[in-house]
Amino acid sequence: MKFSGNWLRKLVDLQYSDEELAHKLTMAGLEVESVAPVAPFFDKVVVAQVVSVQKHANADRLNVCKVDVGTQSDGFLQIVCGAQNVKEGMKTVCALVGARLPELDIRQGKIRGVESLGMLCSAKELGLASDADGLLELPGDTPVGVDFRKYYSLDDCIFTLKLTPNRADCLGMFGIAREVAAITASELDLPEIVFVNPVIEDVLQIRVEEPESCPLYCGRVIKGVATDTAIPLWMSQRLERAGLRMINPVVDIINYAMLETGQPMHAFDLNQINQEICVRFAGENEHLLLLNGERLTLQKDMLVIADSSKPLALAGIMGGSESGVTNTTIDVFLESAFFSPVVISGKSFKLGFTSDSAHRFERGVDFSMTRSVLERATALILEICGGKAGPVTEIGNDLPRREAVRVRQKRIAKILGVDFSVELISEYFQRLQFSYTIAGEMFYVVPPAARFDLVIEEDFIEEIARVHGYDLIPARLPKAPVHMLAEPETGVSPVKRLRQILTAKDYQEVINYTFVDTQWEADFSGNDIPIRLKNPIASHMDVMRSSLFGGLIDNLQFNLNRKQSRVRIFELGSCFSKEGDEEKEVENLAALCSGSAYPEQWGVPDRDIDFYDVKMDIESLFWPRSVYFELALHPALHPGKSARILIDKKPVGWIGELHPRWQSKYHLSQSAILFELRTEALAAELLPAMYPLSKFPPVRRDIAVVVESDVSVASLLETMHLEKDRSISEISLFDLYSGEKLVQGKKSLAFRILLQDSEKTLTDQEIDRAVSQLVGILERKFGATLRS
C-alpha cells in the first residue's frame, strides 16, 4: 500500500516527522517498507510561459526564447533552449539563475554568443523521471511565476506499507488515518461524506440471486457526465503517488474513492446495460472480455455482474471491456457492493492475475461504508464532471454480525505482564474507535465492521499492546510454580532422542519442502501416481513426496557444487502416499552420507564412508533391539548394495548406496549412502535391563563353518541367538573366506563365541556341549559343515 505523506497529514493532525511516523507505525505492527521523497532537492524553479521562440543565429538546433516568469518587472527573460518540443504559448518549468538542480547549478552565461538567463527544464533534469522527450509541459491553467516545488507539492514523501493479510482495513487512507491517530494519540479529521439528493428519477432494476455471496449491493444512475474534463491537480497527485495511472475522470474518481476509503467500486456505461443488473454465478459456456484484454471462459463458481442477456463484470475482481466507461460515455451506472471474501478468495490466483479490487475484497472490506462510498464518488463526479444523479437502489441481506467479545482486565495483565487501569483501557479502545460497554473489570467490545481480524479476546489484548507501544512493555521473567516431577525414561520424545543420537554422530539436520518434482518421485520412489497439488507454489514442486530421498540428494548436489565434499545430513519429515482412494501421511527419518568417513585429521588415514559405517549408525538408533538387514531392490539404490531393514521380521526401512544411474543423471561427482526409516518403528523403546557382572571367568571359542555362498550372515546370527545355550553371551563374525581352497559356490564364516555363567565357572564338558549344540543348529538349518 503506497500513499502520500501530505495526504495523510490532511487527515491526521500529526506532530511527527516522516521518519518518526514510519518508526511508530512499524513498531505498532504496520511495517513501513520505505519512505521515499517525491522529488530530489532543487530550488529557484518557477512556472514559466514561453512568449516567443526564434531560431538561434549560430546553431541550427537551438532556439532563443522569451520567457515570462512572472517576476520580471522589466520584461521577459531570454533563455537559449535546445528542446524539440518548445513552442510559443506553452507553460513549462524554468530554473532561474542561481537555481540548484539535482545534477547542476544554473549560472548566467552565453551559449553560442547569445546570453541565456536561466534554463527551461525537462522532468529528467528535475529528477522527476528517468528519461524525458523534451520540456516538462504543464496544464494551461497553471499560474505563471509560482514556485513549482510548492505549487506541485513536491516537498512530499511516499510511504510504502508492507501489510499483512489480516490488516485489510489499512488498504484505504481512512483506515490508515484511524490507525495513525490511535497510535500517536492525534486528532482525526476525516472529510464529511454528504449524501447526494437525486435530481432525476432514473433507476436500474437490481436483482441479487446470490445473497450469501453479495449481502449488500448499491447502485445509482448518473446522466450527462462530461468525460473530457480533467481531474483536479490534488487528486491526480494523490493517485500517482499511490501508484495508480490516470484513465478517464470517472474511473479516476472511483479509484480515488477506493484509495480513500478502501471500498472498491465499479462504473458501467449505462447504455451498454440491457434492462437490469443481476448478481449471479456464471452459467455454462459464458465468456467475458475483461478490461485487461483477456477473454475469459467463465466457471460456475465465478460470481458475475450481468444484465438480462450477458455477463458485464467479474464481481469484485475486474470489469468487462464492453460495458466499461470510455471517453465517449455520457451516462454511467455506479456500483458499490460488499462481496463475501469467501467467494472472491483464490480467484485471482486461479486466473493468473490480480486487481486492486480483488486484493481488497478477498481480505474483507468495511461493509458499513458501502453506501457512503457511493455517495462520496457521486459527489466528486458531479463536482468535477457534472451530470445529474438518480436515487440510490440498495439491496441488503444478512451482513456479517459483529458479536461483542469479552475482554477481562486480569487477562490483559496476565498476557502482557502489565497492569492496565480501566480508564487506560477505555482510552485505548476509544482511540481505536471500538464500541464497548464496561461491567466491573470486564469490557464487552464490538469490533468495527472493517476489522475482520478481531475475533477473540487475545486479538483485543494485542490491540491494547500495539496502541500502548510494544517497546513500553517492560521485559519481565515469567513466574511459575516449579515442581520437579520424575520423568520415565521411556517418556523422552523419540524424535528428540533421534536428533540427539544423529547430531552426536556428526549428522546435520536439514528441512526440505514436502512439495517435490514429479521426476523425483519416479526416480527415487518408483511412484507413478503421486499425490498432485492443485495450486503448486512452483511448477517443479507439483506433487507431495512419498520419500525423503529426493530432498537429501538435492542437498548433496547443492553442497558438492560448493566444494563441500564431506556431507552427513538427516531429515525428519512427513511423507505422503495413496492407497486406493485414501491418502496417508507418515513420519519418516532419512539420512545421507557422502565423502570421507571422518573429518580430516593428520593422525587418521582417510577413507570414504561405506555401507557398513551407516549400517552401524542404524543399529545405534534401534539399540538395544536387534536390527536385521536382507538383500532387496529399491528404485533409488544400487541393486547390489541395498537392503531392507527389519525389526521383528517386519520391514521398517531401507539402506543402500545411491544408484549409479541417478548419480550420473543428477551430475553428482561422488556417490552416497542413504537410509530411510519409519519413525513409528523407532518410537517403541526398550529400556536396557540391568544384569550383575559375572564374577566368573569368560571362555572364548572360535568355530569356522562352510555354507552356501547365498546364505546370509544375518540369518545365521539370528538363528544362533534364538536357539543358543544360555551360557553363550556373545556371538560375532570375525572372518569371511571364499577362494580356491573351497568348493565353488561355498564360503567360510568364522564366528567368535563368548561363554560365561553368572553363577559358576563353566567346565570343559559344558563348554563343549554348548558349542556342539550351536554347530548342530547350523548343520540342521543351513547345511553347514565345520571347516577343517
UniProtKB/Swiss-Prot annotation:
Q: Name one GO cellular component term.
A: phenylalanine-tRNA ligase complex
Compartments, as annotated in UniProt: Cytoplasm
What the entry lists under InterPro entries is as follows: aa-tRNA-synth_II/BPL/LPL (IPR045864), B3/B4_tRNA-bd (IPR005146), DNA-bd_dom_put_sf (IPR009061), Fdx_antiC-bd (IPR005121), Fdx_antiC-bd_sf (IPR036690), NA-bd_OB-fold (IPR012340), Phe-tRNA-ligase_IIc_bsu (IPR045060), Phe-tRNA-ligase_IIc_bsu_bact (IPR004532)
List the GO biological process terms. phenylalanyl-tRNA aminoacylation
Q: Which family does it belong to?
A: Belongs to the phenylalanyl-tRNA synthetase beta subunit family. Type 1 subfamily.
Source organism of this protein record: Nitrosomonas europaea (strain ATCC 19718 / CIP 103999 / KCTC 2705 / NBRC 14298)
Gene3D superfamilies named among the record's database cross-references:
3.30.56.10, Bira Bifunctional Protein, Domain 2, Ferrodoxin-fold anticodon-binding domain, Nucleic acid-binding proteins, Phenylalanyl-trna Synthetase, Chain B, domain 3
Q: Where in the numbering of this chain does the tRNA-binding domain appear?
A: 39-149
HAMAP family in alphabetical order = Phe_tRNA_synth_beta1
* Gene Ontology MF terms in the entry: ATP binding; magnesium ion binding; phenylalanine-tRNA ligase activity; tRNA binding
In terms of CDD domains, this protein maps to:
PheRS_beta_core, tRNA_bind_bactPheRS
Name of the molecule in the record:
Phenylalanine--tRNA ligase beta subunit
* Residues engaged in binding Mg(2+): D453, D459, E462, E463
Query: Which ranges carry the B5 domain?
Result: 400-475
TM helices/strands, residue ranges: none
* Keyword Oxidoreductase in annotation: no
Q: Where is the FDX-ACB domain?
A: 694-787
The family database entries (Pfam families) matched by this protein are listed as: B3_4, B5, FDX-ACB, tRNA_bind, tRNA_synthFbeta
Question: What does the record note about the cofactor?
Answer: Binds 2 magnesium ions per tetramer.
Q: Which reaction does it catalyse?
A: tRNA(Phe) + L-phenylalanine + ATP = L-phenylalanyl-tRNA(Phe) + AMP + diphosphate + H(+)
Q: Which SMART domains match?
A: B3_4, B5, FDX-ACB
Give its E.C. classification number.
Answer: 6.1.1.20
Q: How does it assemble?
A: Tetramer of two alpha and two beta subunits.
| Required co-factors | Mg(2+)
Query: Per its UniProt entry, what is the enzyme's top EC class, as one word?
Result: ligase
